[in-house]
């Protein structure tokens, strides 16, 4: 599985997930700096107020 792992509006970068991971995630939230985005492997639990999208195809979290 290959997932995108760039932060916010940075140029696209990818990572190969370890351990047989089969999903990617994209988290979005707002803070004092504005809208923030985090991408990576897996499908983590998030705090209330954070939007989480998980998917199961290569680079699906761009």
From Swiss-Prot:
Disulphide-bridged cysteine pairs: 3-24, 17-41, 43-54, 55-60
SUPFAM superfamilies recorded: Snake toxin-like
Listed InterPro entries: Snake_3FTx (IPR003571), Snake_toxin-like_sf (IPR045860), Snake_toxin_con_site (IPR018354), Toxin_cobra-type (IPR054131)
GO cellular component: extracellular region
Compartment annotation: Secreted
Highest taxon in the source lineage: Eukaryota
First-listed, main subcellular location of the protein, grouped into a coarse class: secreted
Record keywords, A-Z: Acetylcholine receptor inhibiting toxin, Disulfide bond, Neurotoxin, Postsynaptic neurotoxin, Secreted, Toxin
One Pfam family linked to the record: Toxin_cobra-type
A Gene Ontology molecular function term of the record: toxin activity
Family to which this protein belongs: Belongs to the three-finger toxin family. Short-chain subfamily. Type I alpha-neurotoxin sub-subfamily.
Protein name: Alpha-elapitoxin-Pc1
